[in-house]
């Protein structure tokens, strides 16, 4: 039997850990279902809405940080080029243009395959990484 065929029992939902971290830090949050939570945090340039989604089928915790910055059609090509240049400089996560809403978002995933659990330290590391990058690049995307 290969390691790929072994099924692991996951002790808990990583979103539960995020909810605990958010509550301990007095962050405003909304738990929309068992596998998703959104945290609202104020930044220097705007308010950020950070969604964490647990995707069990790929055993990954996905972070998406959107900010209220709509990209108009005439600027779309320019912004996509800028996103590519910015993404070249990032070690973790990336910026993306969500075409459905024409908003820029920062995305990052934490792979938790084989029954691994997300620690509060990992979660507390993902969030500042997203916010620091959003704050650093916000004005360039305007």
Give residue spans per PLM region:
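Ser/Thr-rich, low-complexity intrinsically disordered terminal regions
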Residues: 20, 24-68
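Terminal, regulation- and interaction-focused segments at domain boundaries
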Residues: 1-21
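Short, internal acidic amphipathic alpha-helical interface segments
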Residues: 66-103
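A generic structural motif
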Residues: 67-71, 110-119
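Long, hydrophobic, amphipathic alpha-helical segments used as structural scaffolds
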Residues: 33, 91-94, 98, 137-142
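Long, contiguous binding/interaction regions
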Residues: 116, 122-136, 140
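Short, aliphatic-rich beta-strand segments
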Residues: 104-108
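Ordered, soluble secondary-structure elements with a strong preference for glycine-centered loop motifs
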Residues: 8, 12, 73-77, 116-124
């Amino acid at each position: 039997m290969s390691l790929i065929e072994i099924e692991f029992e996951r002790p808990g939902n990583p979103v539960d850990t995020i909810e605990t971290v958010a509550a301990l830090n007095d962050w405003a949050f909304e738990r929309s279902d068992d596998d998703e939570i959104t945290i609202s945090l104020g930044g220097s340039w705007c308010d950020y809405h950070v969604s964490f989604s647990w995707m069990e089928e790929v055993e990954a915790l996905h972070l998406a940080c959107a900010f209220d910055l709509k990209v108009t059609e005439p600027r779309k090509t320019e912004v996509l080029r800028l996103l590519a240049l910015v993404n070249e400089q990032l070690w973790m996560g990336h910026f993306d243009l969500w075409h459905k809403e024409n908003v820029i978002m920062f995305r990052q995933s934490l792979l938790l395959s084989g029954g691994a659990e997300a620690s509060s330290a990992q979660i507390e590391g993902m969030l500042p990484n997203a916010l620091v990058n959003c704050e650093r690049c916000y004005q360039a995307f305007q």
